[in-house]
Amino acid sequence: MDSYTSSDEDASRKENISDEGLNMLNASPEPMEEDDPEEQAEQEEETSRMARPIRSMRKRETTSGESMGDEDEDLEDEEDEDEEAEAREHHESGAHDTSFSNPLSNVDNLIHVGTEYQAIIQPTAEQLEKEPCRDQQIWAFPDEMNENRLTEYISEATGRYQLPIDRALFILNKQSNDFDAAMVQAMRRKEIHDDWTAEEISLFSTCFFHFGKRFKKIHAAMPQRSLSSIIQYYYNTKKVQNYKTMINVHLNETDTYDELFKEVNHLERVPSGYCENCNAKSDLLILNRVMSRHECKPCILYFRLMRVPRPASLRALTKRRQRVLCPEYMKIYVYGYLELMEPANGKAIKRLGIGKEKEEDDDIMVVDDCLLRKPSGPYIVEQSIEADPIDENTCRMTRCFDTPAALALIDNIKRKHHMCVPLVWRVKQTKCMEENEILNEEARQQMFRATMTYSRVPKGEIANWKKDMMALKGRFERFTPELDTTATNGNRSGKVRINYGWSPEEKKNAIRCFHWYKDNFELIAELMATKTVEQIKKFYMDNEKLILESIDTYRAELKSKLGK
């Protein structure tokens, strides 16, 4: 049984030997001539070389010791030792033979195993030479910096002002390591935080599950967020949330978005118009059967993907922008607006301080013949003799003629289809409407008074006054050439000679000028031409009482004429 197993193993080992080597082993040795010992030695060496792999494979087998006996192992060991000794002697004898040549890569056709066959390597240096650094140093920690002060600065900047550590150090470096100046700059800096709501985070996760890192498609599903904001949010949260577990799409294959896009292209559509969801003008509108309206393609894709309408704008979703803040300088007007929008209480005349109060008994009026009458119920007020019949909390009413029913009724009245003239129902009146009504009434009264005053003006006398003024103007224009021809008022040089005396005509003209211009001495002196400003002033001071009496008399005459 052992011999059978051994022969099988030998046969299996021979399979690893090439056909040429197997033929050389099985072939019988040819008879060699006695006078050629070198060829005989070479043939024996070749035979032993081809048989050596079989013996080495036997020695490496771990299971061969269990199947072979002790005698076979001893026999094989002796044969191996004899063959190795013969090969060593042959190698030593042929080392001095220069006629024998082999390839340089395999001189003796042996496997070089052992310390004597190892390559000789030069000893390496204990430490490599330092290569020049090609990086440019931007910042280095100063040796003289106080570490305790630095720790306090970072704690203050990151804890109180919510600045990142790298931002705080950047500010400190910009201020040349001056902690006080850096702290002042840190107080002025404000970090703009891009806060995401829970709904937006959930929507981003869903889109990332469908689209992967196709941020443009995610942006189409989240129009209220910019593309840079979406990318920044992804890189800020990729270390916290494991997005790799969400990806269910291959980049080179079609995804759900592409399939939806193909489906949308086959939906019912209409020509260009305005989207009923986002109110944006689009060249193509598609019918959304679920919402029963026409929407643009982005809104349709968003609805088919998320099953909710696409947000129209950032203002509609962001809570921070839903509430419009009123500027400080507008709060006064807002408070006044709220006050004026309160129901009217009938005290506008007292608030404005104009006009006269009058009693009104038409707060609520009902016309029986009016077809538009829709009373809400009887208006019953229980009151005593001392009580005010008008309730302060009752809203006053005003007429409204712009409703469709009122316009139709007025049209019927014009066509004489309605025989009665009804009173159109009134709407609630506010304080603002009440004050506007009082102001309009006061303006109408003032305009009426002005018209009546104008009608009482004596137009004929005013025309005569205009003629007198034109005559005085012409006289003044002709006054200078007339003075040149007289001997008292002119000289040879052509200049006007100032007369220091007052003639009766000059006194009369001066008093008339005082009637018109009162104490404008410069203008009066310019009109009279022969008197200086000092002379006019002196004349006024000497005759002030007489001049004032003449002015009062002149005004009284004007009032009496206007009163007629």
Swiss-Prot record:
A Pfam family of this chain: Myb_DNA-binding
Example GO molecular function: transcription corepressor activity
InterPro entries membership: ELM2_dom, Homeodomain-like_sf, SANT/Myb, SANT_dom, Trans_reg/Corepressor, Znf_GATA
Domain ELM2: from-to ranges: 109-190
Entry keyword set: Metal-binding, Nucleus, Repeat, Repressor, Transcription, Transcription regulation, Zinc, Zinc-finger
Region (Disordered): 1-106
Domain SANT: 191-242, 497-548
Main location: nucleus
Domain of life: Eukaryota
Biased composition (Acidic residues): 31-45, 68-86
UniProt record similarity statement: Belongs to the CoREST family.
Record-level GO cellular component terms: histone deacetylase complex; transcription regulator complex
Function noted in UniProt: Probable corepressor protein acting as a component of a complex that represses transcription. May play a role, as part of a CoREST-like complex, together with the chromobox protein homologs hpl-1 and hpl-2, in the formation of the vulva and in fertility.
Subcellular location: Nucleus
GATA-type Zn finger ranges: 275-299
Assembly description: May be a component of a CoREST-like complex. May interact with chromobox protein homolog hpl-1.
CDD domains for the chain: SANT (cd00167)
Gene3D superfamilies to which the protein is assigned, alphabetical: 1.20.58.1880, Homeodomain-like
The protein's name in its UniProt record: REST corepressor rcor-1
Species: Caenorhabditis elegans
GO biological process: negative regulation of DNA-templated transcription; regulation of transcription by RNA polymerase II
